[in-house]
Amino acid sequence: MAGQAFRKFLPLFDRVLVERSAAETVTKGGIMLPEKSQGKVLQATVVAVGSGGKGKGGEIQPVSVKVGDKVLLPEYGGTKVVLDDKDYFLFRDGDILGKYVD
């Protein structure tokens, strides 16, 4: 993570701030892909998390991901947040589809 602009932003409640991974621009065979054929990037790295949302009994439910986790995002959704000319996306914890495990 080159910049630290996301440190100026703290998500509230069950929100998660992510930085999308870069799209593949070259195939394994060395062929350059045009932008239209690259597809939408659904992988991201978590850069900040909120404190959690309220459960049914009023207790705070912690967010299910932590900073540094690699996650799978839905194709649509999220709120674009621009910090120091860099694009980040804000999702609810429940909207994140999964977490990659090493």
Swiss-Prot record:
Which GO biological process annotations does it have?
Answer: chaperone cofactor-dependent protein refolding
Subcellular location, record wording: Mitochondrion matrix
* Cellular compartments per GO CC: mitochondrial matrix; mitochondrion
Q: What is its induction behaviour?
A: By stress.
Q: Which UniProt keywords apply?
A: Acetylation, Chaperone, Mitochondrion, Phosphoprotein, Stress response
As stated in the Swiss-Prot or TrEMBL entry, residues carrying the post-translational modification Phosphothreonine are: 79
Record keywords: Cytoplasm included?
Answer: no
Checking Pfam families in the record gives:
Cpn10
Q: Which residues carry this modification: N6-acetyllysine?
A: 8, 40, 56, 66, 70, 80, 86, 99
Where N6-malonyllysine occurs, the residues are 40, 54, 56
Which SUPFAM superfamilies does the entry mention?
Answer: GroES-like (SSF50129)
Q: What does this protein do?
A: Co-chaperonin implicated in mitochondrial protein import and macromolecular assembly. Together with Hsp60, facilitates the correct folding of imported proteins. May also prevent misfolding and promote the refolding and proper assembly of unfolded polypeptides generated under stress conditions in the mitochondrial matrix. The functional units of these chaperonins consist of heptameric rings of the large subunit Hsp60, which function as a back-to-back double ring.
The entry's family comment says: Belongs to the GroES chaperonin family.
Name this protein carries in UniProt: 10 kDa heat shock protein, mitochondrial
Q: Name its species.
A: Rattus norvegicus
Encoded by which gene?
Answer: Hspe1
